[in-house]
A protein has these predicted regions:
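Juxtamembrane intracellular "pre-TM" segments in multi-pass secondary transporters
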Residues: 1-10, 194-225, 412-421, 425-430
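Helix-to-loop junctions at the C-terminal end of transmembrane segments
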Residues: 65-80, 273-286, 372
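A membrane-interface helix-boundary motif in multi-pass transporters
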Residues: 82, 165-179, 367-388
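A late C-terminal transmembrane helix in Major Facilitator Superfamily
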Residues: 344-373
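Intracellular juxtamembrane helix-capping segments at the cytosolic ends
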Residues: 35, 123-136, 328-341
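Loop-to-transmembrane helix entry/capping segments in MFS-fold secondary transporters
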Residues: 46-49, 138-147, 256, 343-353
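Helix-loop boundary and gating motifs at the non-cytosolic
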Residues: 2-59, 219-250, 256
Length: 431
């Protein structure tokens, strides 16, 4: 069998960025705007509750399908490539589901179609994330992670800008978002050179492979918890449209433009923070201080949102959230890749980590109606601020660069043998 070279960074990084932007255009544009408009038409005064049901159901589907997609990608033996296959399939099929969602005529259709969208695009997402572990050199992961972190803001910003070019609530908004997602998937596949997957071990129990014992891999477990807590804090952006409509009485035909303005502020600050934090982390060989910073900044911003007496405070808080988001997503992916139990199972293991991205999309909409009923947006944002602080505290249990946890939970330095073993494992996956 001929060993294929990995994708050069000059092609790999653009492929990662394009694929991730397409993913976030597809999923975050609806969450931040399109679903609000669609459900306001279909559910009227019950739109907030319907939004919670739709996004909660979609997040549960993502929770299930992301690790399954990662495992299938790890074990895909087709010549087209274990990651390319599912980036292309997920983006094209997911785009078709988005088009169908734009034509939905009832809330239950929105629930069903959004679940399909989540399932399909999570195949693309799992395969794309695994490429960082597959092909990015360890000493470059901070910088690459910082660039990839930009996509969580650039994606929905591009999607919001695109959607605002069409009539609010129209099917054309959904079609435009779907077209961008499909094109992004195709471009990423064209840029990538890929490898075949690893054959499953004889007698391997499919379901059992999804359990990673946190006692045996404590660093992995703590990294998962940190991502979950801080992602919950940043899930506040899902309620921006409702927040503006209900607390500040922004007109429905103006809310899209205002959400876009807030996103512009966030993305500019996120871009500066994400790129600089990623490269600075590689330079100083430290990751944890950046995560602590992100959690604390999120908490401060959410407290401002909770007690904002005017829109000026909302703009300031949004800027702080952009700074914190940039610092977090610049470092978090690199940190999670570093504590993976096995490079052969990178797709599945990163997908399990990504449950910490999906679960907040269920948890926050589930608890939000209760918190809103108790204390309005002050209670909701105050609760999310507390989670941000807990995430900042929890990261102290994750080992810093150059150390990993042994089975007893103590930290031990990564040895030359460990590095050689990981490199050899990577080379065995090349086809």
């Amino acid at each position: 069998m001929t060993v294929s070279p990995r994708t050069s960074l000059g092609r790999l990084v653009p492929a990662l960025l394009v694929s991730q932007v397409g993913f976030y255009v597809a999923l975050l544009t609806p969450v931040q705007l399109l679903l609000t408009l669609r459900l306001s038409d279909l559910a009227g005064d019950d739109a907030t509750s319907a939004f919670g049901i739709v996004t909660g159901a979609g997040a549960l589907v993502a929770l299930v399908f992301n690790p399954i997609a990662g495992r299938i990608s790890d074990r895909t033996l087709w010549r087209f490539g274990r990651r390319r296959t599912w980036i292309l399939t997920g983006s094209l099929a997911g785009a078709a589901a988005l088009v169908a969602l734009g034509a939905a005529t009832s809330v239950w259709q929105v629930v069903l179609l959004w679940a399909f969208v989540q399932a399909l695009f999570n195949f693309q997402y799992a395969a794309t994330n695994a490429l960082v572990a597959d092909q990015v050199p360890a000493e470059r992961r901070g910088g690459v992670s910082g660039l990839v972190g930009l996509t969580i803001a650039v994606g929905p910003l591009a999607g919001l800008a695109l959607a605002n070019g069409f009539e609010a609530g129209s099917a054309r908004q959904w079609q435009a978002v779907a077209a961008v997602a499909a094109i992004a998937g195709v471009l990423a596949v064209v840029l990538l050179r890929d490898t075949r997957g690893v054959r499953g071990r004889g007698g391997e129990n499919f379901l059992r492979t999804f359990w990673i014992n946190p006692r045996h891999h404590p660093a992995f477990g703590w990294a998962w918890l940190v991502r979950f807590l801080i992602t919950c804090a940043y899930a506040s952006s899902s309620y921006n449209a409702f927040y503006l409509l209900q607390r500040f009485d922004v007109a429905e035909d103006e809310v899209g433009g205002m959400v876009l303005q807030l996103s512009l502020i966030s993305v500019v600050l996120l871009a500066v923070t994400s790129v600089s934090a990623g490269y600075l982390s590689d330079a100083v060989r430290r990751q944890k201080p950046f995560i602590v910073f992100a959690g604390v900044v999120a908490a401060v911003a959410l407290v401002l949102m909770a007690f904002a007496p005017s829109l000026a405070f909302v703009y300031v808080a949004t800027g702080l959230l952009g700074i914190g988001t940039g610092a977090f997503f610049a470092i978090d992916l690199a940190m999670c890749v570093r504590v993976l139990p096995s490079t052969d199972d990178a797709g599945k293991d990163l997908a399990i980590i990504n449950i910490a991205n999906s679960l907040p999309q269920s948890v926050v909409p589930f608890v939000a109606p209760l918190l809103l009923a108790i204390g309005g947006y002050t209670a909701l944002f105050g609760f999310l601020a507390l989670l941000g602080v807990l995430g900042a505290v929890s990261v102290r249990r994750v080992p810093e660069i150059g150390q990993e946890h042994d089975e007893s939970g103590r930290t031990a330095p990564i040895t030359r043998h460990d590095l050689v073993s990981r490199t050899a494992s990577d080379e065995r996956t090349l086809a």
